[in-house]
């Protein structure tokens, strides 16, 4: 660090006075003499030249009071300069040389070694802003070993070059942070260690005052990063070991996990794949603690897009995902051999889809919340086909069933059974048109037998009930008949 006052000495360096004296005066005699340049000397002479002690004043305000030898300022003295600076100390050849102290008009000062009018060597500088430098100088600039202390608590101890911190040094900041390492052009650069009061510790490369290059960063919370940094942020390849036991190894950008990386959680979860802005995003593979494995697209740390999951029991799903849930179109294969191809919502069959069972049963139709709901076609293992409505997984509403033995029914259904009004055609050719209840003919209906006969009436438990016999009231007795 430099100070404006240190440069002033160059402008105020005393010059040796070459004074022509026409008549020599006895030594130690005090004489006042004025010169053509306006300067006035009052002091002793010897052999016609200033010698001993004297005061010399110039019209510009410069005043020197001190020792003279053979016409030259030499020895101890005090110089007051036009700019208000005051030097008191040793002189040689008209210039400060040796030990001396200069006090500047702004209150700053320097006390220490001088050479040929320049601040050179060891000394202490107090600056107007309250800062203090103790150490080596070269041509009025900090150069060599030195300590700079500021009123706010900032302290630097170490190497200087041409007025700037350069080499090895230690900085103590007002907040208690400490840097110990290399300096270049006044900034932290090279290798160094930074320790913050909250527990953060960084040790590694620095560029332009910022953490850059390879290093190790331990956060206050216990997380540890080892790898590349740029401009104070994690950038490039690195590894984070989190305080909770989790870890990440891979690429970073702008201090965030970005690019390709592997995350391992202490519970057994492992993800390997793409990252963006600190989150799992893109293509990747996740292995879960329960043994499930998902491979596909991710967004915001969750499966999102196209992907396939294989469960521990061997079941799989391959298709669309949204925010971590099975949603969209896909194929689910269960360990039992059941296969569903179709639409999903929140992890359940929902929309149009086809379910095939290993025994040959197939349902192709509408699903709601994992159940058959709406219109669909069910084909059974024995060749029976039902086409119609479903509710809560069972045949309900209007539907038609055709069985391999020739039975055919079209009409109402309830809770999986024929119920309501419909037409049933039996394998023998009989046709019943009427009401049903729980799979039985129940209520009004007509049976047309294959023989051509018909039976029309009320049915119960599948059979035609006998017609009710009318109750005839007894005829009243004739009038006038005696008992």
Residue ranges and their predicted role:
Residues 55-58, 65, 78-81, 88, ...:
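Short beta-strand elements of solenoid repeat domains
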């Amino acid at each position: 660090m430099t100070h404006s006052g240190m440069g002033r000495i160059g402008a105020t360096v005393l010059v040796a006075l070459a004074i022509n004296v026409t008549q020599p005066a006895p030594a130690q005699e005090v004489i006042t003499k004025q010169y053509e340049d306006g300067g006035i000397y009052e002091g002793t002479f010897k052999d016609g030249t200033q010698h001993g002690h004297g005061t010399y004043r110039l019209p510009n305000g410069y005043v020197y009071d001190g020792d003279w030898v053979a016409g030259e300022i030499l020895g101890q003295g005090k110089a007051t300069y036009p700019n208000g600076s005051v030097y008191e100390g040793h002189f040689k050849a008209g210039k400060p040389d040796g030990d001396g102290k200069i006090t500047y008009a702004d209150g700053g000062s320097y006390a220490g070694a001088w050479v040929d009018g320049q601040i050179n060597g060891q000394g202490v500088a107090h600056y107007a802003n309250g800062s203090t430098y103790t150490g080596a100088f070269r041509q009025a600039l900090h150069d060599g070993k030195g300590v700079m202390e500021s009123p706010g608590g900032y302290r630097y101890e170490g190497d200087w070059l041409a007025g700037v911190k350069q080499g090895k040094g230690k900085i103590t900041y007002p907040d208690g942070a400490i840097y110990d390492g290399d300096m270049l052009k006044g900034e932290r650069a090279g290798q160094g260690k930074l320790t913050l009061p909250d527990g953060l510790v960084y040790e590694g490369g620095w560029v332009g005052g910022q953490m850059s290059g390879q290093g190790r960063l331990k956060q206050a919370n216990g997380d540890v990063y080892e790898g590349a940094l740029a401009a104070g942020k994690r950038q490039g390849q690195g590894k984070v070991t989190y305080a909770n036991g989790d870890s990440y190894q891979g690429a970073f950008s702008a201090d965030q996990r970005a690019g390709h990386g592997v995350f391992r959680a202490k519970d057994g979860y492992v993800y390997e794949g793409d990252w963006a802005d600190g989150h799992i995003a893109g293509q990747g593979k996740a292995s879960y603690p329960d043994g499930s494995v998902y491979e596909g697209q991710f967004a915001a740390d969750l499966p999102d897009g196209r992907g396939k999951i294989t469960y521990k029991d061997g079941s799989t799903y391959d298709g669309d995902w949204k925010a971590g849930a099975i949603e969209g179109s896909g194929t689910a294969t269960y360990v039992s051999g059941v296969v569903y191809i179709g639409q999903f919502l929140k992890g359940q069959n929902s929309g149009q889809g086809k379910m095939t069972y290993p025994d040959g049963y197939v349902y192709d139709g509408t699903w709601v919340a994992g159940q058959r709901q709406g219109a669909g076609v069910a084909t059974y293992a024995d060749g029976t086909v039902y086409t119609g409505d479903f509710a809560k997984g069972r045949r309900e509403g209007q539907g038609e069933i055709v069985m391999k033995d020739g039975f055919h029914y079209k009409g109402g259904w309830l809770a999986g059974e024929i119920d309501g009004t419909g037409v049933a055609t039996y394998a023998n050719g009989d046709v019943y048109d009427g009401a049903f209840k729980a799979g039985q003919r129940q209520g009004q209906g007509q049976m047309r037998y294959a023989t051509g006969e018909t039976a029309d009436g009320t049915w119960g438990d599948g059979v035609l009930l006998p017609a009710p016999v009318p109750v005839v009231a007894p005829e009243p007795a004739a009038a006038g008949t005696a008992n």
